[in-house]
Structures are given as C-alpha cells and as structure tokens.
C-alpha cells in the first residue's frame, strides 16, 4: 500500500518542513542569513555655524543641526553605543560662488572635526562629506559657469582643497558626493601630495538624482538658485549598468570604499555593485526614506522602530557593507549595543 507521504515526495514535503526552523526566536536567530549590528552603522550629523544650541529639523523628526559643542557630545554617545563611524555635513553662515567656507581652516566642519578627534580619538571613524552645495550661494555642487552649467574640471581643484582642509582638521575619511568626473583621482592626488596618504576616500559612486533628498536639503538650507536641478551630474534613476561603470572608474582612480545613494529604491544596484567589486560597499538610507517612516509612525499607521530595522536588514541583505542612516543611534539601542 502506498505511503501517505508518496504524493508529496516530489516537493520534499513533509520530509522538509520549512517551519521547523521558525518555531522559536532562538532558532530564527541561529539560522538567520542576515544580521544587522551597530558595527554596520554610520551616523550622519549636521553642524551649523552661528547657533547657540541644537536646532530641530522639522522634516527630519529627531534630527538636529548641532553646535560644535553638541556634536562632540553626540559623537561620544555614538561611540558608547558601539557605532563605529559618523559623517559630518556643514551649514555655514556665509556662502559664495566657490564655496570658500568648505576649505576654511576655521570653517564649521573643520572645527567640528578637530573637536571630535580630540574627544574620541580612534574610537570613531570620523568622515566628512566633501561637496560644495552647502557652501555655495547658487546651491550647485561645483563651480558654475556664466551660462549656469557646472564646470567639472574647475570644481576638481576646489574638491582637492576641501579634502586637504578636512584631512588636516582630523577627518579619517573624506566622502566626495558631487558626482564630478575624475573627482576621486583629483582628491587622491591632493591628499597624497600634502602628506595625507593614509586618509581614505569613500566615494559616492552611484548617487542618483532622486526625489528622496528633500529633508536633507532642509537640514543644510540648500536650494538651487533659479530652480535648477542636479540631473546633469547625478545619475539617472532609470540606469543600472551606468552605476557599475561609475563604481569601477572610482575604484580605478583610488576610492577605498564606494557607496550607493539612495538605498531602498536601489537595492538592485547595491546587489550588483557588491557582486562586481571587492572593496567595501556603503549604502545611504537617505532623508526621504527616514522621513516617510517617521511620518507614518507618527500617525500610528506603522510600527516605526520595526520598519526601520526591516529597512536596515533589507539594505544589508542586498549586500551593503555598512549603512549611513539617521536611525543609527536608535537602531543601535534597539539592537542592544
């Protein structure tokens, strides 16, 4: 007489029951394919010149523009949570056509870098975003010609100057985000020629012209004069193979790490980049992705903490070596740092 199981032998049921390994929390932890820990996280921080106390950012609930003093306190807190890295963005008082404040030794980011390094030493990897848009009066990421277009090669010279200023102030990693052709090579030459051979470069290699950056631009008070956009230098969201070309070029120019930005809408890009290269691959869980979770959670529509961890798990599962996220501190606390 045939066994009752014969009808299922082709599928493996019930010999293999997938639910067996899901029946307890301990089993699920033991067999999980992806793990997110505080070690995977990088905290983006904003530091603003000319304020006496931290200022809330309305479109980024829970995130503030720091003073130099308060950003040091926050850096110490991140270190205590076992978060290994932070990245600084500056909001200067004065802006001009060439973004002079970006390379000013007394600029707000340089002061913050120096103060953080003095306070935490090597407990944290201190990164500095390297771009000009926060510092220019026109809002573009580079030097603008009379016709309103960005002059790629003139911008490279400024990027080199900014990189050296950041490294001299204490940045262990500079992170060029302007998407100029040749930016990594120009920065590497500038760093090496001034004695900063050990300063690493995290290249925003695949940075897309995304609609998800709005809250970030509120945080740094940036708008493009005349209502322009950055589509002439940031990547087209419709393109995937182009990202691999950008990444390979940056690595050939000397990038130590590469990054995909945004993360959630570009998980396929993260996965493709991870499969293609042997350097660490970061991903930026950007301001719009964060703000959507916070807004829905405030309305009681979702469990914001659970969704945040699910997002981070998805980004890690796609292949990210580390994740820049505004949820860094909260996630580290939830993960039991």
Regions found by a protein language model. Name each.
Residues 19, 26-27:
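Acidic, Ser/Thr/Pro-rich intrinsically disordered transcriptional activation regions
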Residues 2-8, 12, 24, 37-42, ...:
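Alpha/beta enzyme core
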Residues 23, 31-34:
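N-terminal leader/domain-start detector
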